[in-house]
């Protein structure tokens, strides 16, 4: 496997820390050891997150190609768009963000706080669009790029989750290599890695990265899209392409991709009671915050899998905390009583 042949523009602090979730593990019976790898604090650029790791492999193309405007898309409370806005500000580039109405949630301040507030503060041209949630290339995003061209600019396209970009999975191939180095220092290997999945490139990169040591199917994706068939197909497709790019040496198949479909409801961006319970439990036992859209759902999935005995006793499970906490402010009504 060869990741080093791809240029990388450093946007993160370096390897993200791994630490034990001792109190949560004990609360769940103590037979499974839970750990977290903190992608949520991986950068000084507006709180960072998993997209910042991905952008390290996209930005070299933007800089080398003389692009002057980063154009990205997400929901109103998109973490991706906030991270793109931060990178643009850091590099002295312009930024246009399309924020679609992906979540069926009404709150008086939903489009004024959290991620979107930070993007505006960082100077991004934020454009609200009424289109609902879906996975793939969006018309509104293509129109935004056309607008930049008409104004004489040179737009660099960054799709939702970085996932439709050919190099969108590379960052999390690097994540797997980083984990292997940390495992050598820790003196043990993780039996399972739990991650949230929606647009697919995070899990796809992990699948390829851990396939290098035979652990592709030990990456457990927790669907948060509530459109798991689309998400699964996207993960497989991106993983196949990423495997070819990094010269993995074997094909990725459907059997390499594990996506748990039980925890994404009721729909994208809306938490269920299990999501909210898991957010509170993790926060109160570990002081580690998760959000209602992504990490609350993957945390719920991990907790339930422990409770149901789906991880064998003695397993060491690594929870990939991908970020997302800035969106909590947009859901303040749900937590008005804690």
From Swiss-Prot:
Coiled coil found in the keyword field: no
EC number: 3.5.99.7
Alphabetized InterPro entries for the sequence: ACCD_DCysDesulf, ACP_carboxylate_deaminase, ACP_carboxylate_deaminase_bac, TrpB-like_PALP, TrpB-like_PALP_sf
Active-site residues, as the UniProt record annotates them: 78 (nucleophile)
N6-(pyridoxal phosphate)lysine: residues carrying this PTM: 51
GO BP annotation list: 1-aminocyclopropane-1-carboxylate metabolic process; amine catabolic process
Taxonomic superkingdom: Bacteria
Transmembrane segments: none
Cofactor(s) the record lists: pyridoxal 5'-phosphate
SUPFAM superfamilies: Tryptophan synthase beta subunit-like PLP-dependent enzymes
Function noted in UniProt: Catalyzes a cyclopropane ring-opening reaction, the irreversible conversion of 1-aminocyclopropane-1-carboxylate (ACC) to ammonia and alpha-ketobutyrate. Allows growth on ACC as a nitrogen source.
Membership in a protein family: Belongs to the ACC deaminase/D-cysteine desulfhydrase family.
Assembly and interaction partners: Homotrimer.
Name the record gives this protein: 1-aminocyclopropane-1-carboxylate deaminase
Gene: acdS
């Amino acid at each position: 496997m060869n990741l080093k042949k791809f240029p990388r523009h450093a946007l993160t602090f370096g390897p993200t820390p791994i630490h034990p979730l001792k109190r949560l593990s004990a609360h769940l019976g103590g037979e499974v050891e839970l750990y977290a790898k903190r992608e949520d604090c991986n950068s000084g650029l507006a709180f960072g997150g998993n997209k910042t790791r991905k952008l390290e492999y996209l930005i070299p193309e933007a800089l080398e190609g003389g692009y002057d405007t980063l154009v990205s898309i997400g929901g109103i409370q998109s973490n991706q768009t906030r991270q793109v806005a931060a990178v643009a500000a850091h590099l002295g580039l312009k930024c246009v963000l399309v924020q679609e109405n992906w979540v069926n949630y009404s709150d008086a301040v939903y489009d004024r706080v959290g991620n979107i507030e930070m993007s505006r503060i960082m100077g991004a041209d934020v454009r609200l669009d009424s289109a609902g949630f879906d996975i793939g290339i969006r018309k509104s995003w293509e129109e935004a790029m056309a607008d930049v061209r008409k104004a004489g600019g040179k737009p660099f396209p960054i799709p939702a989750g970085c996932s439709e970009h050919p190099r969108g999975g590379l960052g999390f191939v690097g994540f797997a290599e980083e984990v292997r180095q940390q495992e050598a220092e820790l003196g043990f290997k993780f039996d399972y890695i739990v991650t949230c999945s929606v647009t697919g490139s995070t899990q796809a990169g992990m699948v390829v990265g851990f396939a290098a040591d035979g652990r592709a199917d030990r990456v457990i994706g927790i669907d948060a899209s509530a459109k798991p068939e689309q998400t699964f197909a996207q993960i497989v497709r991106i993983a196949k392409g990423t495997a070819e790019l990094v010269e993995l040496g074997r094909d990725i198949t459907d059997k390499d991709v594990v996506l748990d479909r039980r925890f994404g409801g009721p729909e994208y961006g809306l938490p269920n009671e299990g999501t909210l319970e898991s957010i509170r439990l993790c926060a109160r036992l570990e002081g580690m915050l998760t959000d209602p859209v992504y990490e609350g759902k993957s945390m719920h999935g991990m907790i339930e899998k422990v409770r149901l005995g789906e991880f064998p006793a003695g397993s060491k499970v690594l929870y990939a905390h991908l970020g997302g906490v800035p969106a909590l402010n947009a859901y303040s009504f749900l937590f008005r009583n804690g």
